[in-house]
A protein has these predicted regions:
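Active-site neighborhoods of enzymes that stabilize oxyanions during catalysis
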Residues: 88, 104-105, 284-414, 418
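A long, amphipathic alpha-helix that forms part
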Residues: 27-28, 178-202, 207-249, 315-320, ...
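His/Asp/Glu-rich, glycine-adjacent segments
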Residues: 74-215, 360
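Acidic/histidine-rich catalytic neighborhood
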Residues: 239-249, 253-303
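Structural recognition of the beta-strand scaffold that forms the well-ordered cores
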Residues: 15-19, 26, 51-53, 68-70, ...
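Boundary of Sec targeting at the N-terminus
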Residues: 6-8
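Short, structured active-site-proximal loop/turn typified by the sulfatase FGly-forming signature C/S-X-P-X-R
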Residues: 29-76, 118-120
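N-terminal signal peptide c-region/cleavage motif recognized by signal peptidases
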Residues: 2-4
């Protein structure tokens, strides 16, 4: 498909979507208050349209959120329910939702292809095997040098070798340093200049990584964001250079961030209630009900959702835990209430934690513990700190327009409309006339 390079022309819009994983909107909208030296991102406030916040999805984690960003539907509809697959017996060895075939609805890449346009993507989640002309997906397994071989196999044939010869080695997969994002930015510029795609998606991951370690708005987080700001500027400049007068550039994020110092581990309580069993090697051997933890929340899955006794046992257990404020539980959602919010169609319950808390995953130990402070997400999307970001510039996009608080499902149809694409499967609506 590389023979299609050069498909970008003056009559066809170029859409570039850059995701900064974990970017809270107030890094940009309140840049002065935080002392953020981010001139490129600040230009988006002046030059284009932006949201004060984006209400995300359940759970507020990377893979379901990124899939909503390109489909305009909730996880229950697009099928990417969390980062990692539910795997209580560890048969999938902590595998993630890597594969595009698991997405059940059309994406922006599909819409572009249907319109006869070319597509490119770098490090975007859930793109292994996607029908993208120039694709370097996000995937890793062991975090060793062997991962580079895997990435070469699942990327567009020859693309990484060509890029290496032109601009140097790609740094993919589990590498979440700011240096790795700078390399991804260089690859984005190179692909824009040499392949001329009509749609390019780029996922930058270093900010999320450092926020987990050092919390949002820490000195370390600010230093990383300032480096990513330069990447944003270079990619935007390249887009506007190769498609002068018809380049749209969006900066989005998947979720915000909150801090924690406390941990609630649901597993010991479930084990004590005989809801799962553990073998002599300390591994789960069978289960009736299990938490599926994602940072600031946990879905509760039942092996047999129609088993009334198990349902009643779990309901009583969660009610007892939620009654005690020392456990840090904000809300427990059940069945239809959860499903109306578009998350976890296979879950019977959902436990959302208060800010300052995260879920644990050990099968033993205390239910509640004080731990080293860090950053997390994954909680309910209506928590203000977990709101995501949206900024858009391009021809005809109103300058300095504040959209207020928007629904993440509105982003894909908004981008599709601006780029002249059709995405009727989206449940959101275009935000600009």
């Amino acid at each position: 498909m590389a023979c299609q390079a050069g498909a970008q022309d003056k009559a066809t819009p170029l859409l570039v979507v850059i995701s900064i994983d974990g970017l809270r909107p107030d890094y940009v909208t309140a840049a002065d208050a935080h002392g953020a030296k981010i001139p490129q991102l600040r230009k988006f406030l002046h030059d284009g349209t932006y949201a004060l916040g984006v209400t995300g999805v359940i759970p507020t984690v990377t893979y379901p959120s990124h899939t909503t960003l390109v489909t305009g539907v909730w996880p229950a509809k697009h099928g990417i329910l969390a980062n990692q697959t539910f795997d209580p017996l560890q048969k999938n060895h902590e595998g993630w939702y890597w594969y595009a075939e698991d997405i059940r609805v059309p994406t922006l890449w599909d819409a572009a292809s249907a319109a006869g346009r070319t597509t490119a993507s770098i490090q975007w989640p859930v793109t292994v095997g996607a029908k993208i002309n120039w694709n370097i997906p996000e995937i890793w397994r062991a975090g060793t040098a062997e991962d580079a071989k895997l990435l070469r196999v699942v990327s567009t044939p020859g693309l990484l070798a060509e890029g290496k010869a032109a601009i140097g080695e790609y740094r993919g997969g589990i590498d979440a340093t700011p240096e790795s994002d700078e390399v991804r930015g260089k690859y984005a510029v190179w692909i824009l200049e040499t392949k001329r795609p009509n749609l390019l998606t780029l996922h930058l991951i270093a900010l999320d990584h450092i926020e987990h370690e050092a919390q949002p708005f820490s000195h370390k987080a600010m230093a990383v964001l300032e480096r990513l700001d330069a990447v944003i500027g270079k990619v935007r400049e390249a887009a506007e250079r190769v498609a002068p007068g018809h380049a749209f550039v969006a900066v989005v994020s998947d979720h915000g961030f909150t801090t924690y110092e406390q941990q609630l581990n649901l597993f010991p309580a479930f084990h004590k209630a005989n809801l799962f069993s553990v073998d002599d090697k300390g591994k789960i051997s069978d289960w009736r009900a299990m938490p599926w933890e994602t940072g600031g929340s946990a879905a509760i899955l039942l092996k047999d959702p129609k088993n009334g006794l198990t349902t009643a046992t779990v309901r009583a257990l969660l009610a007892k835990l939620a009654e005690d404020p020392a456990n840090g539980i904000d809300r427990v959602l059940e069945g239809e209430e959860l499903h109306r919010k578009g998350g976890y169609p296979n879950a019977s319950f959902f436990v959302g934690l208060k800010p300052g808390w995260r879920t644990g995953s050990g099968l033993t130990g205390p239910a509640v513990s004080s731990i080293k402070a860090g950053g997390t997400h994954g909680g309910l999307p209506d928590l203000p700190d977990l709101r995501a970001a949206f900024f858009l510039v391009g021809p005809g996009v109103p300058a300095g327009k504040n959209l207020g608080l928007i629904d993440m499902r509105d982003i894909a149809p908004t981008l599709a409309k601006e780029a002249g694409l059709s995405l009727p499967s989206a449940d959101g609506t275009a935000l600009l006339p």
